[in-house]
Each structure stands twice: as structure tokens, then as C-alpha cells.
């Protein structure tokens, strides 16, 4: 059973029942819907499709809304694409909307002139063209073109190592989040999170619109987010290492080191972490990945990522089904080489010694020493399963829960396989029901030895305090 979770973006290349079915059968744990593109009607149709197929296949697939976030873009150019020459002067006009040409353009963020100073770098279209700030004249930013390249209408603008005073949540984001609450999504991947207050602002909108149970995965995409990573992790349900904008905002050679650092910090506190962007980028165009891409996926898993993600590969690429099946094969092969004893020893060193952690660690240690077929967790809120997952056991973690929403909240937790059950009564009923459900689902067989972890009393969340070893009958 694959332990690494997978999140695939559903888009124009994959919005059919046949392809979504193939995605779920390949192991999709969450569908991602990118609100940087498309309108509510378009996304509503795709969300409805995923809900239909997951019900048909009886799989607890989560639905993730990815916000557009506070991005900066160029205005219109005439012609819509043109070349800037290295060494030429170029002016960014902040005070008004103008039609751009080879000497000037306007941008969507009108206060840029307040944030930058001479010597700063401005990057256009994922860094394809660099501008060096020479002077600020009124609301105009006077630049020199650092390299010859193409610019065009509505291209992304990045300003590395500059704290941009954009609001963390735009009006569009707020509208999209409210739409997500109505659609009963399970998680938000929040773009361009720079500080914990950004996460709390999103949480406030969700709470005010019936989305209290929606998880927030903060996307770390710039230096400010990296600098505030500990505080951001604390207020987030999980983290996404969003390597696209990160690779523009931060020197590219530092991205792998930051990825490892963020994964390690999330592992230490037991919060899920997703590694994303360009994992199989060449499969947008080709039916087979590059060797480097295969290594990238495997190494993210060896680093300790809970989940891996496809963006354009599954949303807009020419080979969406091949991309998802390739990702699954690479993940499964990598998992065969994981040193689970080493993972467990490392987690033990990070132990905070509260009751839930001690019982969960004991559960994983017992499962390893006894070579148990599975760890079965009975959980009302998902807390027990998440804490056990933190210790990366070799045995699969079967999370038995009476809540469909909780089952989907576990979509990004490494190694956790949720099963829906009836509500639990007594402690004995909780244990027997959980084991029976795991047997019924085919995760264990009669005669298997399993380790059961749960919280008693059953109706109190976050109280993992019981461990039992038993043989399946």
C-alpha cells in the first residue's frame, strides 16, 4: 500500500469522468482546483465531478482550493509580446494604466514605487527578464534591462528580497473562499503566505462562512515566508513547499535546502507537508519523465514529505494519466527503500512527551518490534491517526472514523488509510468495530497481529491514551 499521498490538479486536460476515475484509481488522495484561472462555474463543475466519482468509487478524496493570492502582473502591451534589449532603459509606471511598449509598462500593484529602492531586482515572467532599479521618480520606477528577453501582457512580476506591502488576501480570494465553503471543500492551499497573520485572516473568513473544518495549507513561496516559517507552521494545518515562485523569489540553488528544512520542521511537529511544482514538468509534453524528475520525487520522499503534487502535468498536459501513474510508481519504489527504523529514531529524538505522542510512539515501536500487519486507530477527529503518522511506521495506519469529513481531512497524512464506520459506543465496541472494519476492507486478514491505538473516552478529541495488541479473529 502506497504511503506517500498524492494531490493532482484537475483542469482542462482532465475534466472528464473517465480521467478523474483514472486519477482516483491511480491513488489520488486530493484534487486541486487552481483559482488563479477559471471562474466559479468552471470550478464548480469540476468539484461536482470529483464528488460524483469519489462517491461512485467509495474513496475519501479531499477537495483542495488553491487561492490566487496577492500577485503582481504587468498591464497590457502593444503588441502583446515584445523583446526588451539588455542595457536599455525601462520604466514601470505605478500611478496610471498605460499600454506598454519597449520602454515602459504599468503593473497591477500601484504602490511598488514605495517598496523598492535603487539596486533592487524586478523579475518578469518567472524571471525570464530581469530589471535593475536605478531610480524612483515620483510614482515611476526607472530600471535598466539586465538581460534580453520577451515581455508581454499580464505576466507575473516578482521582487526578490523586498517586503511587498500587498494585502495577504485579495477580494477575489475572499470571494473564492466563501465559494469554497458553500461547495464544502476540505482544504485550502493559501498562496504567498508571508507571516502567521496571513493565515489567521484566511481562517477568519472560513470560520465566518461555515468552513471551520476546512484545513489551511500555507504555501511558502518567498524569503519572508521562509523567515517566518516556525510561526506559520504553528497556525497552519499543513505546509506546501511551492517551488515555482520560490525559485524566482529566492536564489535557485537555495530551493533544495529550503525544501529539506521545511519538511524537517513539519515532520518534527507532526503537520503534513506537500512538495509541489515541476515534479514531472517534462510530462506536460512527453509520455516519459526525465531521470532528474524521477530522482526529485524519490528524494522528496526520502526527505520526509507527506505528499507530492502535480500541477500543469495533470491539469493542462498532453499525458495526464501517464503522469499520475508514473508518479505513483516512483513513489512506491522509493518507499521500498525507506529506512523506517531511522525515521522512528529521529522522531523519538523530537518527542515532546505529551500523552498522545508517547502512546503513538509506543504504538509504532510495538508495531515494528512485533512486525504487526497494521496499526489501527479509532479516531473521532483524526488526531490519533495524525500523531501516529508523525512517527512514519512501516505498517499501514488504518484510521477508522465515523466522520466522512475527518476521513478526507486525513488525505494528506502520510501512510494513513481512512475507513468510515458507525459511531463508537463503549471502549470494547470501539476496538472490535475498528478491527472488523479493517478486516472487511481487506487491509488485514484473520490471524494477523495488529496494534490498536485510540483515545478514551471516545467522544473527546486529541486524547490518544490507549494501546492494545491483538490478533484479528
UniProtKB/Swiss-Prot annotation:
- Please give the catalytic activity noted in the UniProt record: pyruvate + ATP = phosphoenolpyruvate + ADP + H(+)
The residues that the entry says bind Mg(2+) are 221, 245
Enumerate the residues binding substrate. Answer: 32, 244-245, 277
The answer, when asked if Kinase is one of the entry's keywords, is yes
Its EC number(s): 2.7.1.40
Q: What pathway annotation does it carry?
A: Carbohydrate degradation; glycolysis; pyruvate from D-glyceraldehyde 3-phosphate: step 5/5
Q: Which residues bind K(+)?
A: 34, 36, 66-67
Q: Which family does it belong to?
A: Belongs to the pyruvate kinase family.
What this protein is called in its record is Pyruvate kinase
Question: Organism source for this protein?
Answer: Clostridium acetobutylicum (strain ATCC 824 / DSM 792 / JCM 1419 / IAM 19013 / LMG 5710 / NBRC 13948 / NRRL B-527 / VKM B-1787 / 2291 / W)
Which gene is the coding source of this polypeptide chain? pyk
